[in-house]
Amino acid sequence: MSVNLFVAGTGTEVGKSYVTGLIIKKLNSLGCACGYFKATMSDSGEDAKRIKEVAGITQDEATMCPYVYKTEALPYIAGRVENNPVSLDVIKDAFDRVGKDFDYITMEGSSGICCPISDELMLEDIVGTLGLHSIIVADAGVGCINSVVLTASYMIMRDMHVKGIILNHFVDGDENCEENLRMCELLTGVPVIAKVKDGDTDLEIDEDTLLMLYA
């Protein structure tokens, strides 16, 4: 049976896919058999291709996501346009199948955490059904504090277990980035567990800290 983690983003274009790929790459370097999962994708599944490139994995793309849409839109819109609405049962079955092939599953979220998957289903409902602990990925630049605090507060209010924050596009020694890190920890009570700089090809994180995210 696999152990699993959900990667939430504070919004689109914060580098969620890239960071997820680095997490999987790091786990595999430690000898962990790690698979990737995402409930829905738009843009004909380009996220899966990016993950494979960053993480260096050979997982079959057909197993990485049960709902791959051509329409570039939120899942509930894409599902309506393409007449293929999302079913929670289909997602759970697909996730369980991946869990039979890998010891660790890293699931990437769609857009931000407050993301409607259908009229009746929110992203958080999927995370809750699958019983996943979570981390938050955010851009370390302007707007970081607001987006992280709002995301963490929402997730905690919804009884989602947030185990850490990863700041992307971080610049060591930059006062704004350093202060954003400090204030995110202070205001949320959630630790920043890693900083990713532009051009990083490996995730700098303590091995025990990484493995504890999945515990």
Predicted segments with their positions:
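Short, hinge-like loop/turn segments at secondary-structure boundaries
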Residues: 50-55, 153-155, 181-184, 210-213
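Hydrophobic anchor at the beta1->P-loop junction of P-loop NTPases
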Residues: 7
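P-loop NTP-binding module
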Residues: 96-107, 131-133, 214-215
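N-terminal phosphate/diphosphate-binding loop that engages ATP/GTP or pyrophosphate donors
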Residues: 4, 18-85, 89, 94-97
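Conserved catalytic-core segment of NTP-binding enzymes
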Residues: 13, 22-23, 42, 110-189, ...
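Switch II (G3) loop of P-loop NTPases
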Residues: 91, 98-118
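NTP-dependent small-molecule kinase module
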Residues: 181-215
